[in-house]
């Protein structure tokens, strides 16, 4: 009987230890993800849409403008990685978590493409990306804790706002910048699909002033990231 008790205690201790290891592993995995995202070490799983494209000759001013726009988009993808990871961390259902992680995987492609394009334009990502990441992760956690309907609602609203600003960037890009345009067109199509999928799976409409606050924070990010 005593040996049985000892055996059960040992078994329970092992389970507790394994759970702790799992939590620790998850924390380290998320920290590694944050470092890779902000340091530009995220590989793309899909081919770069601009791989076969060639730019026309651009003036220095046009190159600077394209670089500013692509830096904004790169920072937006840094925020998307943090946001979706935070939301997935506390998602109530496995289905919602799977949707968020799948979207994050496609957004990682966007991140890698924007990073590559910035290098081609002889520019660099925003110096404030670590701060954007931390803030977005915290927002993702907060959205996720409200439940899956609000979680998916946040995805839908985020993607719709990103879709709108990508449309603006496509209009603003120099006509000669064909490679950036090819990237943004695929990104825009992906964002539309992510929003539609969230809406089909029970996304709730976010009440005011949440969408307005999201738009305000996005404007601040874009103003800073365009320059720094």
What are these regions (language model features)?
Residues 16-228:
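Non-heme di-metal
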């Amino acid at each position: 009987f005593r040996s049985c008790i000892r055996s059960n205690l040992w078994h329970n201790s092992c389970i507790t230890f394994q759970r702790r290891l799992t939590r620790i592993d998850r924390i380290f995995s998320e920290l590694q993800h944050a470092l890779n995202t902000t340091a530009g070490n995220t590989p793309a799983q899909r081919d770069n849409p601009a791989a076969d494209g060639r730019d026309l000759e651009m003036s220095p001013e046009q190159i600077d403008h394209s670089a500013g726009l692509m830096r904004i988009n790169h920072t937006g993808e840094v925020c998307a990685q943090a946001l979706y990871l935070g939301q997935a961390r506390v998602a109530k259902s496995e289905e919602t978590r799977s949707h968020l992680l799948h979207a994050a995987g496609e957004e990682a492609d966007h991140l890698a493409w924007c990073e590559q394009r910035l290098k081609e334009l002889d520019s660099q990502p925003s110096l404030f990306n670590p701060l954007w990441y931390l803030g977005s992760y915290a927002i993702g956690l907060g959205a996720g804790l409200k439940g899956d309907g609000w979680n998916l609602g946040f995805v839908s609203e985020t993607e719709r706002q990103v879709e709108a600003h990508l449309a603006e960037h496509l209009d603003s890009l120099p006509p000669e910048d064909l490679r950036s345009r090819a990237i943004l067109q695929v990104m825009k199509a992906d964002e539309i699909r992510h929003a539609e999928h969230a809406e089909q799976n029970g996304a709730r409409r976010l009440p005011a002033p949440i969408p307005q606050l999201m738009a305000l924070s996005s404007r601040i990010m874009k103003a800073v990231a365009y320059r720094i």
